[in-house]
Amino acid sequence: MGKIQLLDDLTIQKIAAGEVIERPASIVKELVENSIDANSKNIVIEINNGGKSYIRVTDDGDGIALDDIYLAFESHSTSKLRKVDDLYNLLTLGFRGEALPSIAAVSNIEVLTKTDDTNAGIHAIIEEGKIKSIDKVGTPKGTTFIIKDLFYNLPVRKKFLKSDLTEANKISDMVNKLALGNYYTSFKLVKDNKVVLKTNDSGDIKENVYTILGKDIANGLNPIDYSGKGIEIKGYISSNSLYRSNRSHQYLYINGRYIVNYGLTNVVEQNYRSLIPTNRYPVFILYININPNEIDVNIHPTKQEVKFTGDTDIYGILGIVIKNGLY
């Protein structure tokens, strides 16, 4: 008898979820990105016990239609792609249709949602990756996700989670990144019934930086603003008197998405080499808008890495912009 067997659906879902959902902060990221894509102006994140036992994300966005609820928890079902070419024209944060099925595979979920064109909202309960019940309820326009008992069915993964404080700090860091990148949306983060962050939707980048990163950093930043060759770069970079011992205060966004790109980070840091002490790092909050055809975000499960096509000189342009902003 052969040794190779097909995996059952639940096992497949758990394996896939492991690539997307590493910890509570992963769930917050995926749900908040969905809220942003749904045109939300106000997003509230509530967590208990570092998000291990309870995560609640509430928005005032478009809501989810009843027909879409049935598909939302099926793998690779998405409202953001229709064909493979759409991957190279992405202006949304989500696109693979993996987030909700992955979350449902490792937790229990409640959803409250209402669209603008319906009189009643929907209350859905999802357990073991499947919809158990759907009822009509009164609820405001928008969507609320309640996530409970993360990794209840993956005890080994659950054991590797850190302390409540560490996991809560990971969530704070993730919310900071999302809030800095979406300054036209207000964010509120509540940890164990205590409000720890509240931003507004003014669209003022500097005010947002002040609220999230504090007065000392906000007051030590220089503005930059460039537009040309199909690329826009704006944001703030630190003066030569403001630096940190690590890269924790470096924020880079491409088309609204927080990304990690060591090439671009190195371009920025090279301009500071003679200005700040060795083994110290500049602070920056940079927003780059570029034709989505010139980047590929579909290279990592977290969608936090990008590749550029050979048609763009983003590295050279960024270097000049940073140099001009410093001198």
Task: Indicate residue ranges for each PLM-predicted region.
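N-terminal phosphate-binding caps/lids of nucleotide- and nucleic-acid-binding domains
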Residues: M1-Y327
